[in-house]
Amino acid sequence: MHYTVYLAGEIHTSWRTELAQQAAAAKLPVSFLGPVTDHAASDDTGAEILGAETDPFWHDRKGAGLNALRTRTMLDQADLVIVRFGDKYRQWNAAFDAGLAVATQKPLIVIHSPELQHALKEIDAAACAVAETTSQVVEILGYISRQEDWTTA
């Protein structure tokens, strides 16, 4: 079975690239979707496409609307969602994406360091799995992709 996986969460490290490379090396039947990870491009896209704003609220609102269009469309296409919480920034978007995944019945895998366990306990409780590394996630993807041959005894 092939899985389409939405990669949500922090955009300040290369975790998506690491995960995709590890999955490719393991020859897993997965493809990945995700947000625009260029922070400035993500923030400014609404004003660039729909017109400049002098009020920062409306500048951000236009960008958020276009990013929500992308996120919701891709979440709908995904078979499962992986959300990574980093240690450096408060990640409201990551928490929101995790909530959307759960609300739309998408299986959720969460990645974060042990230091965030208490802060993320409710999100962790809603997840199917909580990992600390991309390697653990690749092992999970390998397990759920495993094919059994019941024709031989």
Residues of each region from the PLM?
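Conserved catalytic or regulatory cores that recognize and/or transform ribose-phosphate-containing ligands
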Residues: M1-A153
